[in-house]
């Protein structure tokens, strides 16, 4: 659904406003890694105000919370001691995967500069081979 994908892509980073990321003019109190789950919480909490049901907002909230890296697993959250509710945040739907894949090519600190595939792989390397393998699978599937 291209309309959903476009809207979800526009909303997926909304939680950044609650994070402490001065380099991109965000002065919240949470760590950057939390921006996806914070965005999902914001959407769920405000949906009624916007006249949107919980069921209607949920797919957008899922995109927010599942786009970090190539997804985060319960185990990764525990092992890395991330400040997130320990559970799986893995992109499942095609739309979640497309947005997560596309997001890897851009950085909030350099929004006009698109990364190369090698640049994305380099940035994912510090998190382990699993993320690289997922990205490469998506690249074969969606390839820019």
Give the ranges of each region predicted by the language model.
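Divalent metal-dependent catalytic cores for phosphoryl transfer on phosphate-bearing substrates
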Residues: 1-119
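C-terminal/domain-terminus segments
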Residues: 117-131
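Charged phosphate-binding loop/patch that engages nucleotide di/tri-phosphates or the phosphate backbone
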Residues: 127-144
């Amino acid at each position: 659904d291209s309309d959903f994908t476009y809207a979800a892509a526009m909303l997926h980073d909304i939680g950044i406003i609650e994070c402490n990321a001065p380099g991109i003019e965000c002065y919240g109190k949470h760590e950057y890694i939390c921006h996806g789950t914070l965005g999902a919480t914001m959407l769920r909490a405000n949906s009624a105000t916007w006249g949107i049901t919980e069921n209607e907002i949920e797919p957008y909230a899922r995109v927010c919370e599942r786009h970090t890296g190539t997804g985060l697993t319960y185990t990764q959250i525990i092992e890395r001691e991330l400040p997130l509710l320990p559970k799986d945040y893995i992109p499942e739907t095609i739309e979640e995967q497309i947005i997560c894949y596309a997001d890897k090519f851009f950085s909030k600190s350099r929004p006009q500069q698109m990364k190369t595939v090698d640049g994305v792989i380099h940035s994912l390397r510090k998190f382990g081979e699993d993320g690289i393998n997922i990205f490469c699978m998506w690249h074969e599937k969606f390839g820019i």
